[in-house]
Amino acid sequence: MAAKIIDGKTIAQQVRSEVAQKVQARVAAGLRAPGLAVVLVGSNPASQIYVASKRKACDEVGFVSRSYDLPETTSEAELLALIDTLNADNTIDGILVQLPLPAGIDNVKVLERIAPDKDVDGFHPYNVGRLCQRAPRLRPCTPRGIVTLLERYNIDTYGLNAVVIGASNIVGRPMSMELLLAGCTTTVTHRFTKDLRHHVEHADLLIVAVGKPGFIPGEWIKEGAIVIDVGINRLENGKIVGDVVFDEAAARASYITPVPGGVGPMTVATLIENTLQACIEYHDPQGK
């Protein structure tokens, strides 16, 4: 069996085009364009690349994009004060603080300072709690982007045995909640899991997010499984690979996401969707 490739770049482009059309309709009706504030502290090269892609996507769909590039020496108090200012700004619908933050700044305190109705990353306890209670509003971007991929490929998830490898707050934990909403019987594995291979071999839907190249051998993949690889790892030779041994897995799976070009583009596309949603549902309801 040769797996069908789940093309995240194409689906992400479709999502952005749909958002752009809605923004154009808003502006044509005399309503304001959604606004996104992107905050970067320090000069982490990977963070700079991620932030640039988010700002580019904002421009592409017609959002108002505000950039705040703060020095590495920025204090926690200064960052919190900026967030307070953005929370009170009626032209800003979403606030994104790029992680990781420099040492000395408490990630949790910063993320919890963002108003829940402007938390377009979906990390605030309010938004995670709503997802857990089956009443989601602004949803964590990567898990929601994965669900969008499955939906766009008309993959029926109801009744599937889903296994999530990795239990991070950003992907693994909210992903498990999304999969429950999608009708899956869901298992989350982590560093204390015994016999990881057993869990992988029984997964109809496998989602891997650990950040270790080639962590899951292809021979573990169940015949016909759907494989979603969230990992983005740069090898010493410069090649970008995922957490799953792609060629081996693709020979056994029915669907698989490539790295790059699979999940990554969907994270940014979902951020854009969330910003439009925040604008319409929370801040500018006449634009519905």
From Swiss-Prot:
It comes from the Bacteria. GO terms for biological process: L-histidine biosynthetic process; methionine biosynthetic process; purine nucleotide biosynthetic process; tetrahydrofolate interconversion. Pathway: One-carbon metabolism; tetrahydrofolate interconversion. Keywords: Amino-acid biosynthesis, Histidine biosynthesis, Hydrolase, Methionine biosynthesis, Multifunctional enzyme, NADP, One-carbon metabolism, Oxidoreductase, Purine biosynthesis. Its EC number is 1.5.1.5, 3.5.4.9. GO terms for molecular function: methenyltetrahydrofolate cyclohydrolase activity; methylenetetrahydrofolate dehydrogenase (NADP+) activity. The keyword Signal does not apply. It catalyses: (6R)-5,10-methylene-5,6,7,8-tetrahydrofolate + NADP(+) = (6R)-5,10-methenyltetrahydrofolate + NADPH; (6R)-5,10-methenyltetrahydrofolate + H2O = (6R)-10-formyltetrahydrofolate + H(+). GO terms for cellular component: cytosol. The keyword NADP applies. InterPro entries: Aminoacid_DH-like_N_sf, NAD(P)-bd_dom_sf, THF_DH/CycHdrlase, THF_DH/CycHdrlase_cat_dom, THF_DH/CycHdrlase_CS, THF_DH/CycHdrlase_NAD-bd_dom. CDD domains: NAD_bind_m-THF_DH_Cyclohyd (cd01080). NADP(+) binds at G166, A167, S168, I232. Homodimer. Catalyzes the oxidation of 5,10-methylenetetrahydrofolate to 5,10-methenyltetrahydrofolate and then the hydrolysis of 5,10-methenyltetrahydrofolate to 10-formyltetrahydrofolate. HAMAP family: THF_DHG_CYH. Belongs to the tetrahydrofolate dehydrogenase/cyclohydrolase family. This is Bifunctional protein FolD. The lineage of its organism: Bacteria, Pseudomonadati, Pseudomonadota, Gammaproteobacteria, Enterobacterales.
